[in-house]
Every structure is written in structure tokens, then in C-alpha cells.
Amino acid sequence: MMNRKLFSGIFGVILLFSLFFSCDRPQKSGMDFDNIDTSEDPIQTSYKSEEPIVKEIKNGHFTITPVAEYKLSGLVVSKETYSDDWNAKVSPIDLAIVWGKLADPEYEKYVSFSQRGRWYFYEYKPESPLDPNYIISHSSNNHIIPATENIGLALKTIEKKEKVMLEGFLVNLKGSSGGQPVTWMTSLTRKDTGNGSCELIYVTKVRIDTNVYE
């Protein structure tokens, strides 16, 4: 028979390791077995916020103002994480997401995506049946502000080629970092290009496959 003290010690070690690893795992708030429909455009509705969201950071603070309710269902084609600049303190991850025909495996061979320095880039083959206007209007580089730590943990688990659903708000951000004023504005259209054309999303709910996180 195993000594009680030895058993208690082994159980304690197992429990400690379980708690340690669970700290980095997102906790599901629910399950949704309906198919994530990537064929439709994002849903955007005007929104006027009476109470901006304030985030305090070391050597700074941000005021986040929602300007539109937003829901995006699509396919992740690239993911980039950041940690070195002031932006990363509030938005540590960018997701390049496509929808419509771009999310159809039939067209994957024609268009490729990449990210760098808070930008996303695409390349398409000459024989592609999808022109640049379609590609631009059915893809977006999304700067993600997780509303909760749990959502932030869930976002870290997202992999390329996964279907996701993001719900929350398009937001504008103003504040200071290191004593310097900072501003970050969201795009409100899917048809713009260049500087300022990315969406800044305050995510209040994320669905990855069938798992829902809040």
C-alpha cells in the first residue's frame, strides 16, 4: 500500500502542475456547433458610446471610444504578434482575415497573404479570377484589442486557416505612452487601402471553431 504521505506529495505535485498550465489556457464560455459562415461581409452598425473604455498601462493610459458595433466571420490567413511598442500594450496581435470567395479553398492557390510591421500584404497570380478590388474589399488586417484576459489567451491559440468569428466594436484610441501623446484610429470601410485602412477591434467575444470565449 502506498504511503499516505508519499501519495499526498505526488497528488500535490500533479495539482500544482495542473494549476500552472491551466493559467495559460483560455476558459470556454460556451459551444456553438453551427457552421461559421465566411461567405458574408462583416456586419457593421453605427454606435455612439457614452462611456469610453479606459486602460491604464505602465507609464501611460489609453481612452478607447467605440464608434461601431462589429461582427466579422472569416478565415484567418495570417497572424502576427507584437510586444515591443506602445501599440502592443493594448493590441498584442493582428489577424489577417478573409471572407467571401477568398475563404473558399478553390481560390487559395491564387492569392497569398503575409504581415509585417502592423501591415498586411497580398500577392496574386496573373491567372487569378479575383481582381485586386475584390481582394481588398474581402480581406482586412485587424488590430485586436482583447476585452478580457481570457479572450487574449484564446486569440493566442488561433492558427492560420482556422475559421473565426469576432464580435465587439470598431474603436478609436487616444492617450499617452511614456509621456508622449498617441492616437490610433480605426477604418470604417473595407474598401480603403494604405495607412489607416486597418480595423482596430475591441473584441468582446471570439469563436474559434465550435469554442466560444468571453
Give, region by region, the residue ranges found by the protein language model.
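OB-fold and OB-like single-stranded nucleic-acid-recognition modules
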Residues: N3-I10, F17-E214
